[in-house]
């Protein structure tokens, strides 16, 4: 397995790249915009294909690199299901899985630092975002943070993991790179409290200044999605036109979501189910047949389908359209 930890000196942010090996698919957690070219250089060096990128929460101290990575690599952007509506292409709920090839990552809903914070568990390690830091915990005094929720997320979710589980946070300010659940139980000063009220009292009296980038980073990270206007420019169709045109005999309807999304949100009957991460290969292998078809893509909120139209055009498949706003726009 390839596991690479990157560090951003400006925001003290850790970014993680995961892959099962050279020439395989890759996933990135908590990328920083200014370091996107570094990530891409590493991907090229090891012949890796970036297919998914995750943010643990809406960051307040840096602009996320998710959108830039999406635009440069056609990867799927992912956050937990409490994130604002159209920030990312795919959302995962508590205990749902994110998969790339033989790697399985479990989403854990851990509100407290922010109301939408998630951690992500992969075998022997957990990516804790700003929820649990090394010998510290994430502040809870902005972005709908809540110290009581944070206590529950830490003590009743993260600290229930095996003690040898490695802890990889989104930040560190003292040069630490990794810890374990067992070490944090023993050595983290904020975890030595005797009650939730004691923890809440500590967190509510930190009196820290707001992050320097907060007024720029939060609005920026809330607008990472592909806007409806941009979706329209990518041969986007409003739902009435879309539902009418897919009835044509020469049309081919393609659902770009993953199986768990389809099971959760329903689907339009009669289409192919091809996850977005496989659509380039599908088009390449079936180009001759598809040249005579009108392609109609859809996904959850229109991000992946807009990108699928762009991919189709690289194969000269000009009769490609997609559903603006995705299946969420259909209110099934």
Regions found by a protein language model. Name each.
Residues 1-49, 119-129, 135, 258:
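Conserved beta-strand hairpin/beta-sheet module of binuclear metal-dependent hydrolase folds
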Residues 12, 23-26, 33-109:
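Active-site HxH/HxHxD metal-binding segment of metal-dependent hydrolases
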Residues 17, 97-122, 160:
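Core dinuclear metal-dependent hydrolase active-site scaffold
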Residues 31, 58, 82-83, 113-114, ...:
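Active-site metal-binding loops of divalent metal-dependent hydrolases
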Residues 53-63, 110-115, 167-174, 301:
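Histidine-centered catalytic micro-motifs
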Residues 108, 274, 283-332:
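Catalytic cysteine-centered active loop of the rhodanese-like fold, especially the PTP/DSP P-loop
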Residues 152-166, 170-251, 259:
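Accessory terminal helices/loops
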Residues 226-295, 328:
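Positively charged, proline/Ser/Thr-rich regional signature most characteristic
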